[in-house]
UniProtKB/Swiss-Prot annotation:
Name the record gives this protein: Probable thymidylate kinase
Keyword ATP-binding: yes
Family stated for the protein in its record: Belongs to the thymidylate kinase family.
Phosphoprotein listed as a keyword: no
Catalysis performed (reactions): dTMP + ATP = dTDP + ADP
Keywords: ATP-binding, Kinase, Nucleotide biosynthesis, Nucleotide-binding, Transferase
Signal peptide feature range: none
Superkingdom, taxonomy of origin: Archaea
GO molecular function per UniProt: ATP binding; dTMP kinase activity
Family matches, as Pfam families: Thymidylate_kin (PF02223)
Transmembrane segments: none
GO cellular component entries: cytoplasm
EC number: 2.7.4.9
Name of encoding gene: tmk
Length: 195
């Protein structure tokens, strides 16, 4: 099974991914976590590009969307191996939905992002952790190119659109404590896996 945690920067994806992994392992599942961008050579280029001030320009967003699509293909075999195995779970901190929400601008249509990610495995379940932009900014350890209120607001709106248009996506309010949010994530996993 391939589970993805999504949401704007500062929402707590990394913390919740770690907590979910521990819980699933205690329940007898074999669990691996991954993060986007990956540690591949392509992922390293992406990380460097994300740090540049011009990273949010439309041209750079187009380039990043292509790089992310290529980076995701480095995970394709690994994801496909666990997708049909109920005892193995792969939890990803981000997926191609991040490209749809982050690289979505006036010059980049979501349809193009879907097209360049055509060969990327789709998650079995995506959980969008949702908080408002002000709370996200308070939680961010450091401010980077993508962590400004206007950009986070637009990105959050794009995530909320996905909840309405895509299958197997649920939204969880990430405002409460980490433990309350984790309980809600577990409830969604229990419901999906019919545990």
């Amino acid at each position: 099974m391939y589970i993805v945690l999504e949401g704007i920067d500062g929402v707590g994806k990394t913390t919740q991914t770690e907590k979910l992994k521990e819980w699933l392992e205690k329940r007898g599942f074999s669990v691996k976590t991954i993060v986007e961008p990956t540690d591949s050579d392509i992922g390293k280029i992406i990380r460097e590009e994300l740090l540049k001030p011009e990273a949010t320009s439309d041209t750079n967003q187009q380039m990043l969307a292509l790089l992310f699509a290529a980076d995701r293909l480095t995970l394709k075999d690994e994801i496909n191996q666990v997708k049909n195995n109920q005892q193995k779970i792969l939890i990803s901190d981000r997926s191609f939905y991040s490209s749809i929400t982050y690289q979505n601008s006036t010059t980049i249509e979501p349809e193009w992002i879907y097209k360049i990610n055509k060969h990327t495995p789709r998650p079995d379940l995506t959980i969008i952790l949702d908080i408002d932009e002000d709370e996200a900014l308070k939680r961010c350890d450091k401010i980077d190119t993508f962590e400004n209120k206007e950009f986070l607001e637009k990105t959050r709106e794009n995530y909320l659109k996905l909840v309405k248009t895509e299958k197997n996506i649920v939204k969880i309010d990430a405002t409460p404590t980490e433990d309350v949010v984790q309980d809600e994530i577990r409830n969604q996993i229990i419901k999906y896996l019919k545990l």
